[in-house]
Amino acid sequence: MPKIIEAIYENGVFKPLQKVNFRPGSKVRIVIQEDKKEILRKYKGVFGKAEVEELREYEGEVML
């Protein structure tokens, strides 16, 4: 069953922000999903001068 675990990436290692119950050596799959604020900051200005409502519509359509 999938679990969502927030983590911080430091020095080449993903460090969970809460306790995880895995046996040592367990293999897991990590899906990277950037924070919305980071995504918006990265693409700030791409749309030119867009209305707030217009940007909210785009945000609703975006799937990461």
UniProtKB/Swiss-Prot annotation:
InterPro entries the record matches: AF2212-like, AF2212-like_dom_sf
SUPFAM superfamilies: AF2212/PG0164-like
Keyword DNA repair in record: no
Keyword Manganese: no
Keyword vocabulary terms for this entry: Toxin-antitoxin system
Family annotation (Gene3D superfamilies): AF2212/PG0164-like (4.10.1150.10)
Highest taxon above the source species: Archaea
Similarity-based family: Belongs to the UPF0165 family.
Function in brief: Possibly the antitoxin component of a type II toxin-antitoxin (TA) system. Its cognate toxin is VapC5 (Potential).
Name recorded for this polypeptide: Putative antitoxin VapB5
